[in-house]
Amino acid sequence: MKLEKVLIAGEWRESKNPAGQFHAVNPAEKTELPAGYPVSGEEDVRELLEAGKGAADALRTITPEQKADFLEAYAGKIEALTDELVGTAHLETALAREPRLRNIELPRTTGQLRKAAAAARERSWCRATIDTEINIRSKYGPLGGPVVIFGPNNFPYAYNAVSGGDFAGAVAAGNPVIAKAHPAHPGTTRLLARAAFDAVNETGLPAAAVQMIYHLRPELGFELVSHPFTGASAFTGSRSAGLQLKEAADRAGKPVYLEMSSVNPVFILPGAIEARCAEIAAELFSSCSLAAGQFCTNPGLIFLLKGENTESFVQSVAEQFANGTPGTLLTSAGPDNISATLNILTSAGARIIVGGQKAETQGYSFANTLLRVTGETFLKNPEALQTEAFGTVSLLVIADDPAQMKQIASVLKGNLTGGIYSDLRGQDDDCYQMIEPELRIKVGRLLNDKMPTGVAVVPSMNHGGPYPATGHPGFTAVGFPGSMIRFAALHCYDHVRAHRLPAELLNQNPTGSMWRMIDGEWTRKSIQSAGSSHA
C-alpha cells in the first residue's frame, strides 16, 4: 500500500528504503486506522542529519524577528486546522474532543508557540552579559546543529515533537528541529508538520528548519542523538527508553534532556483530613483519573498518618475510585503495563483495595485501582513501591507517626512534583516543617493544598526535577524563556571588535527593551561608550 510521505530536507517525499510500516489504532474501538506510515531507515536518517546541519548554518543569519514570525504564523495555521486536528487526534488517542482537545490542549499549544515567539523577539532570554572594563561579553546562542525531539503519546499537540514546548523552545533559541513523531498519533503529527512547513515557507526560514519522520528502529534513534551534526535532543516518555537514548548521547558527548517517570508524592496531613476529608478525596480522584491517569504529573503516591480520620479518608477515596468510570488508555500496551506494575507493587507488600484488573470495555482500559501499604513496609521496599503506573492507579502509604513520615520522605526518588496538604489553623505546621525540607530537594515543583496535574505555561514554572524524573535537575521543559536555555550554547567574546559582535552584545541595546547585565547590573540602558560604565 502507499505510505504517507515524510518531511525531509524541505520536501514531502516518500521514505527511502523504509524498514517497515505501521498503522495508528483507534484505542476506543481497538480498530486499525487506514493510513499507512513508514518506519524510516538509514537513508532517511542520514538525509535528516545532513539537511538539519545545513539548516542550522543558515539559521545563523536569520533574525530573532523572523523566528518569532514563524512561530506566530505556525500558531495561526494550527488554529485554522482546529476541526481537522481535533477529529484526527480524537480518533488516534480517544481523548475527548471537548473540552480536552479543542478547548484545553490546542489553545495551550498555540499559546506556548506565541510565548516562545515573544521571548525570541524580546531577546532577554539570551542573558547578554557585558563587562566593559575588560571588554568581555557573552550571551546564549544556537547550538550549531539540529535539535532532535521525541514526543510522547499522551499529549498529541502540547508535547508533540513538531508543535510542543520542546519544539517551540528549540526554534526560539535559533535551532532547526528533527521531529520524531509518536506512532500512537502519526496522522495528527502529519497535519501539524504540514502547517509548520507552510509557515517555514511563508516566513523565509531555511527549508529544512522543520523536518519530521513517523517512526524508526531504536538503533537509528541512538544514531540521531549521538551524531556529530546533532546539537541536542529532547525526549518525553518511559524511563527505559529515555535512559537508552541518554547512554547513546552521553557516549558521544551530546546533551539530551529527558522527561521520564514520576509518581508525584502527596502528603496529606491530619488537620487537612479533619477539615476537608471529602473535598480532598474528590480532588485526589479527579487528579488521578484525568485522561485515564495518563499524565506525568499524576499523583500516584499518597502519604497519610495513621488514625481514625485517616481510615475515613481512605474509605472516601476508595468509594471515588470504585464509582468512577474507567477511562480509555492510549495504546494496546497500556493495560498490560499497568498489570505488570501492580505485580511489582503487590510483590513488595502493597494490597489492592479497589480495582486491580482490566476493565471490560470496548476500548483499551483498566479498572481504577487503589492500593495501600504500611509505612514500615514502604521503608523496607522503597524502590519497588515507587514504581510508576501509567493509569488511574494510586498507592496509599499509612505512616505510624511524623518521624516515620519524614523518614519516608528522605528515601523518595526524584520527581517532577511533590505536594503537602495541611490545615489552615496551624495544627499541621510542626509536621509540615519536618517533611518539607526532605521533600523540597526531591522534586522540581512543590505544591501546597493542590493536586499536581496542571502545569501552567508561565516563566516561573519548573516542569523538571531530580533523576529519575529527568536527566538533570536544573532545567524545565515548560515556560519561556527558561525552557529555551536547554537548546542554547554560551557564546563568549573576549576583546572582539564591535563590528564583529552580535547585535545583543553591542553598546547600543538592539531593542531598547532587552534586559542585559552590564558591569554586574541588570539594565535596559545602552552603554555610553566603549570602556565606560553604562548610562
Task: Please provide the spans of the model-predicted regions.
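N-terminal Rossmann-like NAD(P)+-binding subdomain of aldehyde/semialdehyde dehydrogenases
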Residues: 1-135, 169, 529-534
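Conserved small-residue-rich beta-alpha loop and adjacent elements
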Residues: 18, 125-203, 392
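Residue-level signal for inorganic ion chemistry
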Residues: 30-31, 67, 89, 174, ...
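Conserved C-terminal structural/oligomerization subdomain of aldehyde/semialdehyde dehydrogenase
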Residues: 32-35, 204, 230, 302-304, ...
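Structural signal for hydrophobic packing residues in well-ordered secondary-structure cores
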Residues: 56, 60, 75-82, 86-89, ...
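ALDH superfamily catalytic-core signature
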Residues: 77, 195-202, 240-380, 407, ...
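A structured beta-alpha segment of the ubiquitous adenosine-cofactor-binding alpha/beta core
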Residues: 136-138, 211-234
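Hydrophobic/aromatic ligand-binding patch that stacks against planar heteroaromatic rings
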Residues: 168-171, 224, 248, 408, ...
